Regions:
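Metal-dependent phosphoester/phosphodiester hydrolase catalytic core
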Residues: 1-189
Length: 189
């Protein structure tokens, strides 16, 4: 728990100069009534400012933002986006513009919720295409058949197979290795 804000869920954890995890609360502070406005609130102002400042000041080689739902701009329509970053365009633009305009290096996103697994670019082209996201899933859930529509060049890997995912940060090689392992223990990516 946070020492002065015991109900606050968002926080960060650091492993030396190698990795810093930024854990978000993207459910408890969201304001759906603002979704389509210029002031869309996906995260509270305090949490957004904390994330922006943390990413800017972090000296960790890899900065992994852990979020319950994806920030990727998917090439298909999946609902109206009210439950993910895509539905809060102003908030999504604020954090992604902050990262790209300040040239913050080593930022990755890790999320789930779509009942599929993938590794890909946040956007198919433009400055945000350098940012990457890993979706963990489907776990033990029924796979989302939309994984079949996630193809290169935006997506390097997609699966509907039940699996778990690991990340390995190697600062000496400047690599963050993503590994998906199926129920039989076989690496599928």
């Amino acid at each position: 728990r946070h020492p002065t804000e015991p109900d606050r869920l968002w926080r960060s954890f650091r492993w030396g100069a190698t990795l810093e995890l930024f854990i978000l609360d993207a459910r408890g502070e969201r304001r759906p009534s603002t979704r389509t406005t210029r002031t869309a609130q996906y995260l509270s102002r305090a949490q957004m400012d904390w994330l922006k400042e943390g990413l800017l000041r972090s000296t960790a080689r890899f900065k992994v933002v852990v979020n319950s739902v994806p920030i990727t701009n998917f090439p298909f329509t999946f609902g109206n986006g009210e439950d993910r970053w895509e539905g809060y365009a102003a908030a999504r633009d604020e954090i992604l513009n902050h990262i790209t305009e300040r040239r913050i290096q080593g930022v990755w996103w890790l999320s789930g919720d779509f009942h599929l697994g993938c590794v890909g670019k946040l956007e198919n082209s433009g400055t945000r295409s350098a940012l990457r996201e890993v979706l963990a899933g489907p776990g033990g859930q029924i796979p989302n058949p939309l994984y079949l529509s996630l193809v290169p060049p935006q997506f390097d890997f997609t699966t509907g197979e039940n699996n778990y995912v690991t990340l390995r940060a190697d600062p000496a090689r400047n690599e963050l290795t993503v590994r998906f392992v199926n129920g039989d223990g076989r690496a599928i990516f």
